[in-house]
Amino acid sequence: MNQSEPDPTPAAKGPLSGLRHWQRQQQRKQRTRAARLNIIGSALRLLDFNGIDGDYVEFGCFRAETLPLAHRINQTLPMQRHLWAIDSFQGIPAAQGFRDLHPRWSEGRKFTSAAAFQRHCRRHGVPESAMTTVVCPYPELNALASDQRPDNIALVYVNCYLHSQVMHVLELLRPRLKQGMLIIFDNYFAYSRFHQSGDRAAFEQFQRSTDAFHFCRYQTFGFAGCSFITEEHFA
């Protein structure tokens, strides 16, 4: 998914059919971009309204589809936030278990190199000073040096694909959770016919092991995305 809607009909042969297929693809991309822009905009404005400081951090950086949106909105708000892009930049890895399996998650897909990501961001007006790009395999996230990881986080955008990746992301976030932080999952409802989505399964497991916080559902978006507000118990 990656909030990119699946094509309901394969491209038929012939130039006219090919053109129609391309038009449908462009329409889906526009809907996806609008949904992401809306949720990131709502989240950043809510954080600004509530006075929650901290950075924007995204995990999963395919095609630089979300960080430029965050930068665009960030520029319009009083509370400026540094932008972090953290990914392996190697595409979808091999599945580590059955919860990593999904009909659209194929090993090697969704590949964008770090250089291509940075180039896309510059092209969309994101200055190098506004962002930090971190290249790191997901199993090594907790071993990042202190200058290579964000510590004060306000908004997290989780756009990696596999359950195992999301588990590593959540473990990095565990000691950095705070009252008012927002977490957005791009693939929260990406179920398969056999089991719940990797994002949802990982987040539910994480919630059961987190005593100091609970998570209030905020907004759904697109056809598979969902967001949550982090709340301290009795806050």
Q: Over which residues does each language-model region extend?
A:
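S-adenosylmethionine/decaboxylated-SAM
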Residues: P8, A12-A34, I52-A235
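Conserved alpha-helix/loop element of class I SAM-dependent methyltransferases that forms part
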Residues: N38-G51
